[in-house]
Regions:
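Globular "head" domains of long coiled-coil molecular machines
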Residues: 1-222
Length: 225
């Protein structure tokens, strides 16, 4: 979406989820619960604090808000983007670190309401048994899923790793496409208007998946309902 909202890193980088939806202009707010855990989703029991959108990362990152000491529910950013205009909302969650982590539990609780899951890892290594265990459980809750391997510009061997990961997914009976992407190549392509570099970044393939297999399917199901 061409907006550096969510922190990235090689370890668990964020401690709070970030919701990204459509808006007339870029804006952001922090959402706190004023009630019990059971009342957390009630808008009447929430406090919303506007912040500059460029500061979202400060409040959701593990380094400045370790294990969510600030007790945020989530950060909510709004952007004027065509991808989001049809109602698509993206949610960036903290790294799951296996089924037994608190982050995994929080992600699992949100999956039944999600239209799709993007499982993101970098292109340096094949999936661990903990990650495959997480995916096996996650796809029971949200069958519309895809895998995304990032930083492919840093790992010349990423395609071999991708094939190994496709094999792991198939062996586990997980039917989901896998995409390789590079945000750095995407940024360079946008800056130079280089169509070939944009294609190499892999981002367009992921956007097409979101438009067709997520937004398109959701609209079709809504029309049938």
């Amino acid at each position: 979406i061409n907006a550096p909202l969510c922190p990235v890193g090689t370890d668990i980088t964020t401690s709070v989820a970030t919701m990204v939806s459509a808006g007339d202009a870029p804006s952001a707010e922090l959402v706190y619960s004023l009630g019990t855990p059971e009342e957390a989703e009630d808008p009447q029991r929430q406090r919303r604090v506007p912040i500059p959108i460029e500061r979202v990362g400060e409040f959701v990152c593990q380094a400045r808000n370790p294990d969510n000491e600030a007790r945020l529910l989530y950060a909510h950013a709004r952007l004027p983007r065509s991808l989001l205009a049809d109602g698509l909302t993206l949610v960036d969650t903290p790294g799951v670190g296996g089924l037994n982590s608190a982050h995994a539990a929080a992600t699992m609780s949100a999956l039944p309401q999600a239209d799709a899951l993007l499982f993101v890892s970098d292109g340096s290594a094949e999936y661990s048994s903990a990650e495959l265990e997480f995916l096996t459980t996650a796809l029971r809750l949200c069958p519309n899923a895809a895998a995304v391997m990032t930083k492919i510009d840093l790992y010349p061997d990423w395609e071999r790793i991708a094939e190994i990961n496709r094999g792991h997914l198939a062996a586990a009976g997980l039917a989901m496409p896998l995409f390789g992407v590079s945000s750095r190549l995407r940024e360079a392509a946008v800056a130079t208007r280089d169509a070939q570099l944009n294609a190499e970044s892999g981002i367009e393939a992921v956007l097409a998946h979101l438009r067709v297999d997520v937004v398109g399917n959701a609209q079709l199901l809504g029309a049938r309902a």
